[in-house]
Amino acid sequence: MTQSKNKVVIFLGPPGAGKGTQAARLAQEHQLVQLSTGDILRDHVARGTALGQQAGPLMEAGQLVPDELLIALIRDRLADMEPVRVIFDGFPRTQAQAEALDLLLEELGAPVSAVPLLEVPDQVLIDRIVDRGRQAVAEGRAPRADDNEETARKRQQVYREQTQPLIDYYARRGHLYTVDGLGTPDEVYERILSGMH
């Protein structure tokens, strides 16, 4: 990957597949900015920006932030980035969001470069999530509230229902490639790199 040109990577995969771990490493080693819409939202709310003032009450009420507002927040974040070198982690979640993001990226002259889909068998994912909770307790940290088997299974089901149209969308555009998410983090990382063009 050259560092002087635009690069937009969107990680897809179920909860527990290792997207965050792999995205962080790719960002660090290839001078990409890892963007989390949640972090962007919280930053705007904390700074009291106009966009943050719109998003804050929705977030406090536990409501979804409308796609138009999310895209406006992303547009604001990418506006000063030259070249645009980002990894999206946790966004888009729907085909409508993907289509809106594509329009924005085309405006910026920075189309999607790659969409690695981390695939891991469901039972392995559930075991990873439950183990993550156990490890937190063993280290004296509070486990994430959703690091239990019942919640993990529900999250897998929701992921499958919500994400399949997104997988199909990026596959039709030729951006998607499947990565075997089993093995060591280094092995998975090498598979991610080998799939990028």
Swiss-Prot record:
Residues 141-153 have a biased composition (Basic and acidic residues). It catalyses: AMP + ATP = 2 ADP. Keywords: ATP-binding, Cytoplasm, Kinase, Nucleotide biosynthesis, Nucleotide-binding, Transferase. GO terms for biological process: AMP salvage. It is an enzyme of class 2 (transferase). GO terms for molecular function: adenylate kinase activity; ATP binding. Residues 36-65 are annotated as: NMP. AMP binds at residues 37, 42, 63-65, 90-93, 97, 144, 155. Monomer. This is Adenylate kinase. It comes from Deinococcus radiodurans (strain ATCC 13939 / DSM 20539 / JCM 16871 / CCUG 27074 / LMG 4051 / NBRC 15346 / NCIMB 9279 / VKM B-1422 / R1). The gene is adk.
